[in-house]
């Protein structure tokens, strides 16, 4: 969905379709971004279940249940780390460097997607702790505030 990737969308969709076709044992689901510049390439997605964007809670549920994620979203990159899911980040660079090498890898070009996918396809379990925290920050803040107030 990133502007930097708009010209690459057709190539990424073709690579994703190739992965889906060559891995019939896996279900590929793509919540499609509402941007018309992305949607106009939907016909390139073969063997991929294309769905409308998911509400946040449904997206979190999908992330928690999936095996592997391919995305260019930094937010999804963070959520994937929290749920110990491997993610292939389709960008030349990311602002979220903490998870690179553990739960995420950069896929800088569409033609690199197959290699990244094959690397993570069988090796999809994340052993490392989430670099963005354990999900208890609000409770920790409340405890600190109780001591201060």
Predicted regions and their residues:
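Nucleotide-activated sugar donor-binding and catalytic core shared by glycosyltransferases
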Residues: 2-30, 35-149
């Amino acid at each position: 969905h990133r502007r930097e990737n708009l010209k690459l969308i057709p190539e990424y969709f073709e690579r994703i379709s190739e992965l889906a076709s060559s891995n019939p044992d896996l279900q590929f689901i793509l919540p499609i971004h509402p941007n018309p510049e992305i949607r106009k390439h939907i016909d390139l997605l073969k063997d991929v279940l294309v769905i409308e964007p998911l509400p946040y809670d449904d997206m979190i549920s999908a992330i928690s249940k999936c095996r592997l994620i391919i995305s260019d979203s930094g937010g999804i990159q963070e959520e994937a780390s929290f749920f110990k899911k491997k993610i292939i980040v389709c960008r030349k660079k990311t602002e979220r460097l903490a998870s690179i090498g553990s739960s995420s890898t950069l896929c800088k070009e569409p033609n690199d997607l197959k290699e990244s996918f094959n690397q993570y396809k069988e090796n999809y379990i994340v052993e490392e702790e989430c670099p963005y925290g354990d999900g208890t920050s609000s409770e920790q803040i409340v405890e600190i505030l109780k001591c201060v107030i």
